[in-house]
């Protein structure tokens, strides 16, 4: 028994020395193969690492060379260890990133990957970062010991809610934050800018409010015209699409060619029934565009109708609700008197508004007064003003050098004209009794109305003197003196200066025969031309 134990011990020692190379070093994790449970042998040997016994007979140079060889072998071993470590590091990290990129491609493939039509596609995703994920990423970046499984799970949980990129997302965020659509905010700011511009530039002071109101109404009507046309077109298009959907069963019936039996049957159907041809309606829907169903006249009619009836509709609706709420608490017997009182109140309001229109005239803006009707004495003055339109301020006798118009004058009109001319001559003689030069008076159309009536400006001139006076002064003078002056005017026009004794019968004759002495302008002008005198100087015209 003892001998057998000794024999087994010797065999174990022998086998131990025989398999010295297969000894497992528990601290060497680089050369350990976990699958086979043995140590991997090094592929290259750069020298003997065993410690050799120092031979005392060797020189120092040989010892130095041996040390350098051993140092070189150790350096190569360290490099090999680093390379193996890097390979293991890369071999462990590559699968992690491969799975991460594969997940990104899978999520993007659900939304659409770039192709020939779309060179680049934008996506949105949320990044979820936890504390454990942050620690694993920091270990990996710093080169510390890390676990591939933990890093893979961390990267897989980072990207969440993968979706396509929405360029209008900021609008929704703006609306969620402020509760208002960005377009409405922009329009309000634009209106405020317009108001500020009107106030700053004082443009509103140059345009009256009633003019602005009319322009706003016109612009609103024009905008509503296009607005209603688009609305009617949309409605017609929707109705057209609905009719096309209803005609879908007739696609095969109306599209195929008919043989002689079907043509015969169609002829009998048309001859014996009043039903419309469904294929005709089908082809009308296919050929006629809905845009031709909405002419501009229809849009204009709808716009005008809405422009007038829509306000009345809301007024009637409000009135009906008011009457309904008023009658709800009133007994049935009192409802009729209340309605009568309301009707009388409305009529009274309308009557009062009609009576207050002249008081509110200034709210309607400036209005031009109608031209005043000309009296008989003003006809010649109006003719002179019309004829003197092209004359200047110094053309005193310009208005008497031609016919003033085609208005016929009666005997009373001629008499009033003669009276006015006599008064003009009298005022000239009173204000300028001596001197060869006669004054020239600016007429009413050369000065403002008030200045021409109150302070006529006198300018010296060689032309005949004519003074414009108001018609009121003409009507206030006595008729006898006017007729006498008219006779004297006739004598002065003929170029003769009679004596005092001869003037009295002429005055009496002028009082009896006013029409004969104050002749028309054409007869006296011809007589003056025959005598060689200027017809302009005749005050009787």
Curated annotation (Swiss-Prot):
GO BP term, pick one: chloride transport
Sequence similarity: Belongs to the chloride channel MCLC family.
Tissue expression from the record: Expressed in testis (spermatocytes), liver and lung (at protein level). Expressed in spleen, liver, testis, kidney, heart, brain and lung.
Positions of the UniProt region annotated as Disordered: 362-381, 511-541
Keywords linked to the UniProt accession: Chloride, Chloride channel, Endoplasmic reticulum, Ion channel, Ion transport, Membrane, Phosphoprotein, Signal, Transmembrane, Transmembrane helix, Transport
All ranges on the Lumenal side of the membrane: 19-184, 239-329
Catalytically driven reaction(s): chloride(in) = chloride(out); bromide(in) = bromide(out); nitrate(in) = nitrate(out); fluoride(in) = fluoride(out)
Transmembrane portions of the chain: 185-205, 218-238, 330-350
Site, as annotated: Ca(2+)-mediated inhibition of channel activity: 25, 181
Record membrane topology: Multi-pass membrane protein
Protein name stated in the entry: Chloride channel CLIC-like protein 1
Physiological role: Anion-selective channel with Ca(2+)-dependent and voltage-independent gating. Permeable to small monovalent anions with selectivity for bromide > chloride > nitrate > fluoride. Operates in the endoplasmic reticulum (ER) membrane where it mediates chloride efflux to compensate for the loss of positive charges from the ER lumen upon Ca(2+) release. Contributes to the maintenance of ER Ca(2+) pools and activation of unfolded protein response to prevent accumulation of misfolded proteins in the ER lumen.
Record bears the keyword S-adenosyl-L-methionine: no
Gene designation per UniProt: Clcc1
